[in-house]
From Swiss-Prot:
This protein's name: Uncharacterized protein R383
Location in the cell: Virion
Lineage: Viruses, Varidnaviria, Bamfordvirae, Nucleocytoviricota, Megaviricetes
Cellular component terms (Gene Ontology): virion component
Keyword annotations from UniProtKB, A to Z: Virion
Length: 348
């Protein structure tokens, strides 16, 4: 297991305030923003029929984690030995993010739309690592003042890219209003293949000192689920956006001239995530096509899940190993993305 974290280039190289949003250049349309090849879109997605695949419950044997398994070697049972309880995917994803980026130690006031999950994460962290840090966690926007960390998770299942953009867009003004200088914000994303999503990521990155994209290891290999992690708000800021009209799509945020080194990270991320999803899909299809659901292939798949479980516990419950994840992953990704970029230049 090698967690893959994509570090986005700094949008502003000094402490200046990002340029104001030009509302006149924000454009809505009757048609959704299309997926573009230049951001890594290809026809792999068109080759997968996930509805047919997931209609057969046996498909879960081919996932990295089957959260419905409850035998003694399952992910939920083994991690319950560590955390004391069995949790849903949202818990493990938040656990990874908050620990990798050390946000759980740097934040006391937290605003989130999944307060129960964040409470479970912080309580588990205190018990496991023997700390007495206190947290103020709220989902009440009226009580969200001087917030140090925002954690927004929008869905347990994949959401269409254009639909998610509307949800985030409608939240932005209030999310920025509650933050203070130095705050951190985590936003759930899914596909990142349209111009408007890349514009949003670029725009938000300009307000923070660091920005990352991360697909948690505990997220399904068949899911497009990932997170935008924004570290260190440069200055207390407000975002004034026009109202999102009903029955329309956001086509542009008016952000032009996004540098190539920024979009190349998006391309590289998709070049990691999409093939892995397709390989998982083919593995499961081949297993289901055998019609032998508890034979040798099944046993091999369960062994893979059991190994994944032990690897996850070994990495994400050991403080010394957690501390190395970010740097190790960024070095690995930077090297591979640089090689990918050179190949693109050679064949362009």
């Amino acid at each position: 297991m090698k967690p893959i974290i994509f570090s986005l280039p700094r949008v502003i190289n000094n402490e200046s305030i990002p340029p104001p949003i030009n509302k006149s250049k924000i454009y809505f349309d009757d048609n959704p923003s299309p997926k573009l090849i230049k951001y890594g879109f290809n026809n792999i997605s068109e080759k997968m029929d996930l509805n047919i695949l997931t209609s057969d419950s046996h498909y879960k044997a081919g996932l990295n984690i089957d959260f419905t398994r409850d035998d003694k070697n399952s992910f939920v049972s083994k991690t319950a030995e560590i955390f004391g309880n069995q949790y849903d995917p949202a818990f493990y994803q938040a656990w990874e993010i908050l620990n990798i980026f050390d946000l759980i130690n740097k934040s006391e006031s937290i605003y989130t739309n999944i307060p129960e999950t964040l409470l479970e994460v912080t309580n588990s962290h205190k018990k496991l690592f023997k700390t007495n840090k206190q947290y103020n966690i709220t989902n009440d926007i009226n009580k969200a003042i001087n917030i140090q960390l925002i954690y927004s998770r929008y869905s347990d299942i994949d959401i269409d890219e254009n639909a998610l953009i509307q949800l985030i867009y409608n939240d932005l003004s209030s999310l920025f209003q509650m933050q203070i200088q130095g705050s951190n914000m985590i936003l759930q994303l899914f596909n990142v293949q349209t111009q408007v999503t890349v514009q949003l990521i670029y725009l938000l990155s300009s307000y923070y000192t660091e920005a990352y994209l991360y697909k948690p290891e505990s997220s399904s290999d068949l899911s497009d689920n990932k997170y935008l992690i924004l570290i260190g708000l440069r200055n207390k800021s407000t975002i004034d956006l026009p109202k999102f009209p009903s029955n329309r799509y956001l086509l542009s945020l008016g952000v032009n001239d996004i540098p190539n080194n920024f979009t190349s990270v998006i391309q590289c991320m998709n070049s990691f995530v999409m093939p892995n999803k397709y390989e998982t899909y083919l593995k499961i299809i081949n297993y289901l096509n055998t019609k032998v659901y508890e034979g040798a292939t099944y046993q091999d798949l369960i062994k893979e899940q059991n190994k994944f479980t032990l690897d996850w516990i070994n990495i994400f419950t050991e403080p010394d190993k957690i501390k190395t994840i970010l740097d190790d992953s960024i070095n690995f990704v930077d090297k591979n993305c640089a090689n990918s970029s050179k190949l693109d230049e050679l064949f362009s």
